[in-house]
Every structure is written in C-alpha cells, then in structure tokens.
C-alpha cells in the first residue's frame, strides 16, 4: 500500500509568489503555526508547481504520513469548511466577525455566537465470545470492514446511542457497554466515541440494507491484519484481533 507523504507550502513560499494573499490563523502544532490562505485556483496551482507538490484526495489521509501532518490536514479541512459556511449571522443576516478570545464567530449586531460544528458519534465493537461484529457500508466510497456506527441524537446518552444504533443496523441487543477512547474526525466534522459491548441474547443478525451492505461475526483468526492505523474503527478492530482489551 502506497504511503502518501504530506507537506504544506510554507509562508515564505506563498509570500514570494502571492504577496497580497490573506491569512487566517488556525492552530499551532509543535511550535509550527498553520494558517488558512485565500487563493484563486490559478494561484494554488502555481504554488504547487513552485513547491513541487500536488493535491490529493482527502481519503488518502487514512494511510498518509507523518501522522502529525495528517492531524493538521484533517483539522484544517474541518475548520476551512466551518469558516466557509459561516459568513453571515443566521439570526439577523449581518456579517460575522472572529472573536478575540475563543474559537467562535460572533455577530456584532445581535450577539449571536457560532462555534465550530462538531457532531458526536459512536463507533461500536460488538463482541460474541471470540468473534467481533464487522460491517461494510452501503453506498459509500469506503469499502473495507467497519464497525457499527452512528450519530448521537438530542436528549440521548452515548450509551443509549450505542444500543439504538446496534439495534437499528443489525437487530441485536447489547450489554456490558464499556467506553474505549475518542477521536476527532475532521473528515466529516465528527468527534467519535468508541465503545465495546457484548451481544445480549440471540446473535442472529438482521441487516439494515439501507445502511449496510453486510454484517457478520468474524473470529480473531479471520480478521485482516492489514488495517490502516489512522481510524479509531481500525484501531478497535486490531485491539480485538490481538486480544489486548477487556472483552
């Protein structure tokens, strides 16, 4: 599998070629500041030509390196989309301005505050003895193995989301729900919370074919070893395969 090496144009590269470019601070990573830059398509292509770079599809980030630049790229993508979609106040239609203290856009007229959109979602590893419930999405670009997943609803705890999503996608009931870890997922503006749980009662699967193309129990020995390291989903699958958790 090809590993895509990520690099970013530096300030001096852009300044030399596009002296009138406008910069917007995003974040700092290991003492390196990252900025959002407004450039025309022609200027972007020129900068890439000068620096020897090229654009890659965001989905290649799943297997890219170095990992700290993957984090920077995904987070930058998340913030770029938020800024791009929030120029005007949704309450009074006046132009929003950046707050001086926190990551927030504020309306100077009515006081409306707009924060970055972060969607809470769960990733669920359902176990059945030495087997793990693996799924594949229906109608999505990502075609590899996944776990049951879904968005948290208003008024719902994350544990309730786990039970509901497993039931909706596979018809299974679960018990002994345990939190594993979380991961920001800027591809889709999400914060992911990973959980492991056990099947409760029958292990007969009823697949929701609108959401999934398949769902099946897979033993540790049958789980593929060539999983991408980036995603929480694949980390959880690997943790189960290697029997490193409390299952």
Predicted regions and their residues:
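N-terminal strand-loop-strand
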Residues: 87, 104-147, 151, 173-174, ...
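Short functional micro-motifs and their immediate structural scaffolds
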Residues: 94-97, 115
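Short linker/helix segments within small regulatory modules
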Residues: 98-103
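Hydrophobic alpha-helical positions that pack around
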Residues: 148, 162, 166
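Surface-exposed, charge/polar-rich loops and edge strands
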Residues: 156
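Active-site-adjacent beta-strand/loop module that shapes the phosphate/pyrophosphate-binding cleft
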Residues: 183-206
